Amino acid sequence: MNYSTDNTRIVDRKKVPAPYELVNKYPINDEISKLVYGTRNEISQILHHKDDRIFVVVGPCSIHDPQSAIEYAERLSIENKKFSENILLVMRVYFEKPRTTVGWKGLINDPDINETYNIAKGLEMARKLLIEIAELGLPAGTEFLDPISPQYVTDIISWGAIGARTAESQIHRELASGLSCPIGIKNGTDGGLKAAIDGIQAANHSHVFLGATKEADIAMLKTAGNNDAHIILRGGKVPNFD
């Protein structure tokens, strides 16, 4: 008897568009590419103390309603222009939520917030929203949680984050080493710095690992390393101020 030993706990499977399909469906224009390229470089200059402005990522905990996000972006873009000489503002546009146990995992995973998990719809909504925000002249930052989803949106992301719950993950450190944008790594949920410091050192280096391409092929990827990795102090058992 040949026993079933493969995918025995997978109960459903639905195909989603390959990254290149959504990228081609919702391409970025020259102005958006200029915005993303320029703000990535500006963030890098600030991180390396070659620009004395303050870099601030501001916005909601996570995106659940694209229309509300656009209204927020419209207001933030006004402030961005007002304070641009002293502050580089990036809008926090988080589509994925890491959970300590279970709960809603974000717009990409469950865009209708009703446990229907229409990931194809979520990916499309995420890309469309990022383009609309960029058209306002506002750079966007996001947390990278799933190792495949970056292929759908990273060309519109000026800054990225690795969360406290994934800072020690080898997969996410490898991912950070290959991202085209500056990447912040949070300190651990206990407030300790070691996970973030180790994560930065790992992200600085080249890595070789399995990953997905824009064509949705599985490939060996080799990264150059990310010298714009830095710590995000999230606090722990007490606030950072204390």
Map each language-model feature to its residues.
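N- or domain-start disorder-to-order transition segments that initiate the globular core
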Residues: 6-50
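Glycine-rich anion/phosphate-binding loops
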Residues: 63-83, 116-128
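Generic N-terminal targeting/processing segments that precede catalytic cores or assembly contacts
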Residues: 35-53, 68-82
